[in-house]
């Protein structure tokens, strides 16, 4: 390009720049502290931002990892509670796809222990909870962002329990 003296068509990013959608979220908590991932109990958030926390994606790739400082037993318990409210009716107690809804004619309820789902990145599971897939409706407007991640953590716990029982 003739616009810049060095012939480039654009400028290089400033050192330390993180591309949009690549940074793990580190939100300010409601009490004003920084550097902590959001608490699932203190914030209400249904938003659709562009960070990994909101989308499960880094640019055009599904991300792996739960975007909290630590996946604690309390966080997994929160996921279990939210799973029981929103997911269990179809996916069943253990995630095998044998919930009560299947007994009333709903077909193709996913077994969360299938290899195709076990092999999904955490971000893809988060996206499925958010937007739905096939016959599953999306829950992005019904389940807070933090709680969707807690459900992903709980689903991973169910999968690990099933794998260890083999």
Protein language model regions, located:
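Periplasmic c-type cytochrome electron-transfer domains
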Residues: 1-71, 143-152
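Bimodal feature
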Residues: 69-73, 81, 103-105, 109, ...
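Extracytoplasmic electron-transfer domains, predominantly the class I c-type cytochrome c fold
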Residues: 106-158
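Sequence/structural segment immediately N-terminal to covalent heme-attachment motifs in c-type
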Residues: 73-96, 130-131, 151
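Periplasmic/extracellular electron-transfer cofactor-ligation site
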Residues: 84-108, 135-138, 142, 157-166
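Phosphate-binding glycine-rich loops and adjacent basic patches that engage nucleotide phosphates
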Residues: 29-47, 84-92, 111-119
């Amino acid at each position: 390009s003739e616009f810049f003296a060095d012939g480039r068509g654009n400028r290089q990013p400033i050192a330390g720049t993180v591309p949009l959608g690549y940074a793990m979220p580190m939100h300010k908590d409601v009490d004003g502290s920084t550097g902590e991932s959001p608490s699932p109990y203190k914030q209400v958030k249904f938003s659709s931002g562009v960070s990994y926390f909101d989308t499960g994606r880094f640019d055009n790739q599904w991300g792996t990892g739960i975007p909290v400082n630590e996946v604690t037993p309390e966080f997994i318990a929160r996921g279990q509670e939210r799973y029981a409210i929103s997911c269990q009716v179809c996916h069943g107690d253990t995630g095998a796809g044998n919930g009560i809804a299947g007994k009333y004619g709903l077909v193709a309820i996913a077994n969360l222990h299938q290899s195709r789902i076990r092999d999904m990145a955490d971000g893809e599971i988060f996206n499925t909870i958010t937007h739905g897939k096939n016959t599953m409706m999306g829950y992005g407007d019904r389940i807070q962002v933090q709680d969707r991640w807690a459900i992903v953590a709980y689903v991973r716990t169910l999968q690990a329990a099933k794998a260890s029982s083999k």
